[in-house]
């Protein structure tokens, strides 16, 4: 390593010689020797004291030794430098140069090539003088140095008292001397950061002098900026070393730019480092620097800028942190202040101020407000900025009042003031625009805004509002006028009640009927008003026809305001305060009279409960008062913020449980606690029974898919818990009111259900009070005189019993309150008098009254006209009122009844009804005798068919169909998730083609009141409890309740003829003898009003357009098969049990075929024997409902069922009828083909004549007695016109021999083809089995290891043979632990548990599930996953296609099966058994094992609510995997595949074990 001794020289001397400051020699040396910022000193002096001059550092010399340093070039060459600075020191006393020996001038002395100074120390800074020992001490080597080169300094900055000429002269003399001594040198200009351009050019001239011969290189430097310092010394070293490739000389501008970029980079890196690492403005410099010292960026910054710059940057960052914190806190206060303004100062007009002093007055107003301390606090000792640093202020949620002194707070107030004023203007404009729309006659229903926009141009209210606001107001107005127009149209239809009466008992409404109705009403303005909404108008007409045909509450156009519903509410409220009415459950609102207390428990994590409580308090005020339907409720709260232990100690007197969640974590916690609390202890006494629960979702700032997922999960949980679900985002403005309304309504419904019906067996009079739906008067005024009686006792939801004096004796009178349309259910009951109320403002009210009065003309009648307030004035002031009162009086005279008027605001007492009660009592015996005479004709004996098929039976009791709660039943009906599913089975696939009116709606779609969007498919929380009604399709015949449904017996005193049951008791041996029938001829049943599945149509117009307006009748209903025009909306009663009617063959001309009885039976075919064994049965006994197979099996095994049934009290007993095993016709959905109900001729059991006790004979047609072939069971039936009628099948004549011969040929050919096909399949299966055996022999490890290698350890067979061990253990565990678990297979288990279970079995097949502590629902889910994901499909694609054909889901044209098999249930059952026998043995064994498990589960359906229907719904997608192309295909196949699985469960002994089949119709 080369070592160089460099001497730095420049102009020196007194101020007269060098000017006020030096040329920068010391700074240049300092930066070169110690470049770090903390080691660089800018204050170097040449005026010293005598002591400093004589010290070891100066050592009485006029030069300084700066020490030695090592530098490396870019090429990696390393040099060592010893630096000498030649200067001239002045005496501080004389300001003259110190005299040291012989003194040469500085210009000559500085160019000396050798310097001597013994024991001279290294110079660092001026502070070192006098205290040398406190600094590093380094002695000049050997006390002498030979100078190798010179750095000549030229100052280019302007300095006072120094001329450039003097400096140029000095530099030129020095350079000349150095060149004479033949020493290398470089000319260095210093202070270029403050350079003067003239001086720079002078320096350049010096270096470019020709006599220097380019030996003088010019380097531009700046010691303060550390630019080109090393470059000057390295270049001099290379010149001394005579290196050819020297460093490149870079100009000052380029070096300065590079230096600036470096500094900026280091500064940004350190700034970013400090911002990331230092986030608390309380951190001290000592702590922060220690924390940052471990980072390279920080150390590099300190080297360049120094610690002082680092500390300055740190403190600047701390100040920014504090300012940010203050701004953040201020914004929080301002946000709270904005909310406080909305609450404390809702009306700016209350201030009565001008804009100038508004802010000052507002502050004074807030400071004097009564709730000031709730939102603000004052702290005179310190300002709010100082409070921020205090820990005590962190928990303070109120606003420091001195925040209002800031300009930002005033800005918030000004913005609030402007927004309030703008909102007032906007509200005014909206109101003006709404009034403009109401006053404009050209805005009609259905007209778009674009059509009338030009008419509003120039109006201020229209121009001021935005496009969105105008459209929103216009839409609201359209909704209002459309709703009003629909009400008027309904009113128009009701006014023509007399005309619509002719359609009441019509089975099929034709297109001509619709045209005639339209001709009658089309001239009315109320009809024309809906010209633009023709589809809705047409649908409303259809709905009205449906209501006329089946007048039940669900079809009432005033659904929510139906009188039947209002009466229930009124009687419930009135009876609640009566001491004779039993109290309800434990979850009640406390208090009595007009005030009640609601005790609410609010549960949620992460302060959600507290936030919800604050919202409730804001809505209910400080006193916690809430008014609902004129009833005041006082709210008490109890919250549990994440404390789910509150469930264990919950107060049984609470009124409702409100559960709130916002994210995945809070939902999982809430769901876990709810399930453990409400679902896991069902076998114990449930203290949460009837507890209203509301699930509230308040989403956080989540992604849209996460919000949608949590919303769906919440809705699924609410369905499982049978509670209500509220999404805060969808109705954030009034969701609190929705919560409180749901809790109160639930309590009311619970109280209504808790009232014990009062027996009404011994009443002296029964009076039916009829009120028309939609009348605009308060029903309470009518009911009040009755309920205020001290002897009042509530009999049921619609009747009360009052003890009253009639004449001289006290009589017990039952008042039945009903709507006009609800009177049909009391048609056959004994009623002693009718009281009809009608409104004097509605023509429709009187029109319907006239019809009802005509139907009961022989019974005492009281007509009461309800007028507006004003009494007599109402009669004279209103023409319509005068007309209707006069007409009502005339109706009363015509039917010999009494007439009275009743003012809506009139208070009357019970004596108001006394005159009519006296009249009813006087005519009691005549009415009862008349009732007995009429009742005798209803039924004449067993098995007769005298009742007309067009006679509509009465609906079931109101308390059954109207007040059934939407909860789990005890008869295995399953949860509400499955109650509304289609309940088809194999025996119900034969359906009539005509579509009845009830098909217009799904089971879960109900017509709503016109005010509540009657025509829209929307749900309403108020009626959630009544949405699943058992009797929602009741019309013309007794219902057949399919699998999974239940029927509750009536306990009212009613005379209702019961239709025969079509079910056989489980376990009875089917008989081959047929019961004798009273008649040899039968008629087709009428069809029940069905419902249109609106999900099959995207628009209402599609629904109306596809109503199947056909030109030919279907043969159903009247049984005539004539070609009359049919609308496709069958109004008959064919759905449900057949009742007293039976199918009969009808030929083309409408003639009936009579068949003689046959005897004998055929044993030639095993298939025929199975067919007959399934189809034939013993005499059927009458039952209350056509229940499911599971229900019948449970009833037969449970003796308590019969013992616990309450006898139905009836005024007139009827004989039991003999059940006829007829398939239950069902209404198919649009677009699917279903064949009509047919029964083979030889199974139609006909009596020879009479109804006497004759010996029953086998039911085989006479012309088939001698036939011994097995094919005679396949003779087709001709059932009138239709697909299988004379138009589509060969005409069936009475030439039996020819017909039978042709049929036998076809059947023999089919049997041969079937036999050959089966033989080929068997041969193919045998060949496959042989191949499989050969493969197994080749494998030394056997079948078990092969299965394990292919499918994993889960497929290892168990001890039971071919059953996988995983399947075996799961089934054993579920049957051991989960048969009593409610919703098994329906309630999913945890995915973590499922994955753990599979993992454990993969590791060890001998794993015991009991030891894993896994819930039974998780095991059930794992079992389903095993079938769907781990186990190969049990059914091949060909087998699945045959399953579809057997189920009847394919049309006849696409099916390989014949018509008989497609249309007959027993044939399909035999075909299903044959199909299962085609399965491979392993598949059949697994299928048999799992279905045997399903039988065990369904046998415990009373405990787990999973009967065969619900199991089929849960399992069919798993067992029968089909790739659906679209939803239409899925909806078409779903009911049939469900029935396949349900039948395999119900018929398990027959299909899998070879036993006799259960007969279910």
Swiss-Prot record:
Q: What domain of life does the UniProt record list for this protein's source?
A: Eukaryota
Q: Which SMART domains match?
A: RhoGAP
**Keywords of this protein's UniProt record, alphabetized?**
Coiled coil, Developmental protein, GTPase activation, Phosphoprotein, Repeat
The activity regulation comment is: Negatively regulated by integrin, bsk and Src/Src64B.
Site (Arginine finger) location in chain? 1386
Q: Where in this protein does the record say Phosphoserine is found?
A: 973, 975, 985, 988, 996
Q: Which InterPro entries match?
A: FF_domain, FF_domain_sf, P-loop_NTPase, pG1, Rho-GAP_domain, Rho_GTPase_activation_prot, RhoGAP-FF1, RhoGAP_dom
Which Pfam family, an example, fits this chain?
Answer: Ras
Describe the location of the pG1 pseudoGTPase domain by residue ranges: 592-765
Which part of the chain is the Rho-GAP domain?
Answer: 1349-1552
Q: What PROSITE patterns does the record point to?
A: FF (PS51676), PG1 (PS51852), PG2 (PS51853), RHOGAP (PS50238)
Annotated pG2 pseudoGTPase domain ranges read 766-926
Keyword Coiled coil carried by entry = yes
Q: Does the keyword Phosphoprotein apply?
A: yes
Which CDD domains does the UniProt entry name for this protein? Answer: pseudoGTPaseD_p190RhoGAP, RhoGAP_p190
Region listing for Disordered, in residue ranges: 1054-1074
Alphabetically, the GO molecular function entries are: GTP binding; GTPase activator activity; GTPase activity; semaphorin receptor binding
FF domain span: 252-320, 365-419, 426-480, 482-547
Q: Pull one GO CC term from this UniProt entry.
A: cytosol
Q: Name one process (GO BP) from the record.
A: negative regulation of cell size
Functional summary from the UniProt entry: GTPase-activating protein (GAP) for RhoA/Rho1 that plays an essential role in the stability of dorsal branches of mushroom body (MB) neurons. The MB neurons are the center for olfactory learning and memory. Acts by converting RhoA/Rho1 to an inactive GDP-bound state, leading to repress the RhoA/Rho1-Drok-MRLC signaling pathway thereby maintaining axon branch stability.
Protein name, per record: Rho GTPase-activating protein 190
Native source organism of the sequence: Drosophila melanogaster (Fruit fly)
Its gene is RhoGAPp190
